[in-house]
């Protein structure tokens, strides 16, 4: 008879958790940032608020966003006027949309990741699903299992209402699942749709308006497993360590509340300051075991909460401009997609590395960091190890 220790040993993987595939998806409806203020004030019947509209135009100009994708279009908003008011009961209408559309968009991203992975979906042992867009029972994890035709025995974890740091959280959880369950293949999906936060303008809460200028829809999926079978699986990044912390003196800096009016979003003015002041401590703790203290020697994936956060982090750490290039590119092409953003950036980085003929998946560098920032103020820090690019792939 096997001892507990022997059973335990047999359950564990040998090597680190590894990202084996990435897929992304957006709704088809694309809105350019230059046109958004006119569209937004017209659709919410707020054109009479001329000063506020000018203010919103300046917010959109400064956002460094070129375009965003949104499930909500003119037709849907015309049918749901309460969603266009600043504070009107509208949760039922919002829930009706997101309960269906969040798993659907997640399916699109997951299907791409599974296709890239190239293995039968019956080999997926775990599913981690994350969304800040609506809640339901059984959850979006259950709906996605059905939509994809995963095995009924797939082990599911549903994460609702985490917010913008959760792209780091899902990787931290997937790492623990993959490394503690030999042969596990974890499908991770983040799917976000702004139908839950969209609302008309008000001059009393400008932080709500900031959200309207930044948020976009998107879903991203990754497959994570340890001890990859390199004859059929292609490792992209290894997940070496992961940490979560609540920043000091940050109570109420970012929060959201699900109410009859939908998900309301609040943030204090100094969020970029709080993050940039504390980020070096997170980096130092994460990279001390590796003896790394030159932050420019790393490849960077940071949740692009907004341009001010990126600017202040860059300046505080003395980062070279190219360090946040992939991060800024995703912000400019998609806006802030909450938890899905960092996975989009991971995808962007490996693609750039392959197409640019780099020697590793991390822009030619060995070590990297992935940061999530969100409500709390909570910070997720994931240490990544890149993988050498096979010679045939880089040509």
UniProtKB/Swiss-Prot annotation:
Pathway this chain belongs to: Secondary metabolite biosynthesis; flavonoid biosynthesis
Catalytic reaction equation(s): (E)-4-coumaroyl-CoA + 3 malonyl-CoA + 3 H(+) = 2',4,4',6'-tetrahydroxychalcone + 3 CO2 + 4 CoA
Domain of life: Eukaryota
Residues at the active site: 164
Residues spanning the membrane: none
Protein name: Chalcone synthase
An annotated Gene Ontology molecular function: naringenin-chalcone synthase activity
SUPFAM superfamilies, sorted: Thiolase-like (SSF53901)
Keyword terms of this UniProt record: Acyltransferase, Flavonoid biosynthesis, Transferase
Induction notes from the record: By ozone.
Entries under CDD domains matching the protein: CHS_like
Organism of derivation: Betula pendula
Database matches in PANTHER family: CHALCONE SYNTHASE, HYDROXYMETHYLGLUTARYL-COA SYNTHASE
Top EC class of this enzyme: transferase
Protein family: Belongs to the thiolase-like superfamily. Chalcone/stilbene synthases family.
Its biological purpose: The primary product of this enzyme is 4,2',4',6'-tetrahydroxychalcone (also termed naringenin-chalcone or chalcone) which can under specific conditions spontaneously isomerize into naringenin.
EC number(s) recorded for this UniProt protein: 2.3.1.74
Signal peptide: none
GO biological process, alphabetically ordered: flavonoid biosynthetic process; polyketide biosynthetic process
């Amino acid at each position: 008879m096997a001892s507990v220790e022997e059973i335990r040993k047999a359950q564990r993987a040998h090597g680190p958790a590894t990202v084996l595939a990435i897929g992304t998806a957006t709704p088809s409806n694309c809105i350019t940032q230059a046109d958004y203020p006119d569209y937004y004030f017209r659709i919410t019947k707020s054109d009479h608020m001329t000063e506020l509209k000018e203010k919103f135009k300046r917010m959109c100009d400064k956002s460094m966003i070129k375009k965003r994708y949104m499930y909500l279009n003119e037709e849907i908003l015309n049918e749901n006027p309460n969603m266009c008011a600043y504070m009107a009961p509208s949760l039922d209408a919002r829930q009706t949309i997101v309960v269906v559309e969040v798993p659907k968009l997640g399916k699109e991203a997951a299907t791409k990741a599974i296709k890239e992975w190239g293995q039968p979906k019956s080999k997926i042992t775990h599913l981690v699903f994350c969304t800040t867009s609506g809640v339901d029972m059984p959850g979006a994890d259950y709906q996605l299992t059905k939509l994809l035709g995963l095995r009924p025995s797939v082990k599911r974890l549903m994460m609702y209402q985490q917010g913008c740091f959760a792209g780091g959280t899902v990787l931290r959880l997937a790492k623990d699942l993959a490394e503690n369950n030999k042969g596990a293949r974890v499908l991770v999906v983040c799917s976000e749709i702004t139908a839950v936060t969209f609302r008309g303008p008000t001059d009393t809460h400008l932080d709500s308006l900031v959200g309207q200028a930044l948020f976009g829809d998107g879903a991203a999926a990754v497959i994570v497993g340890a001890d990859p079978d390199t004859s059929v699986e292609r490792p992209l990044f290894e997940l070496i360590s992961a940490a979560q912390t609540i920043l000091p003196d940050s109570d109420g800096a970012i929060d959201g509340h699900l109410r009859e009016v939908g998900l309301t979003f609040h943030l204090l003015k100094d969020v970029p300051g709080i993050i940039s002041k504390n980020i070096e401590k997170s980096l130092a703790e994460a990279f001390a075991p590796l003896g790394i203290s030159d932050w420019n020697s790393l490849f960077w994936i940071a949740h692009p909460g907004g341009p001010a956060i990126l600017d202040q982090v860059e300046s505080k750490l003395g980062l070279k401009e190219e360090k946040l290039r992939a991060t800024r590119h995703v912000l400019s092409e998609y806006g802030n997609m909450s938890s899905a953003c960092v996975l989009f950036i991971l995808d962007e980085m490996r693609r750039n590395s392959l197409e640019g003929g780099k020697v590793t998946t991390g822009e030619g560098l060995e070590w990297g960091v992935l940061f999530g920032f969100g409500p709390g103020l909570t910070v997720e820090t994931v240490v990544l190890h890149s993988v050498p690019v096979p010679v045939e792939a880089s040509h």
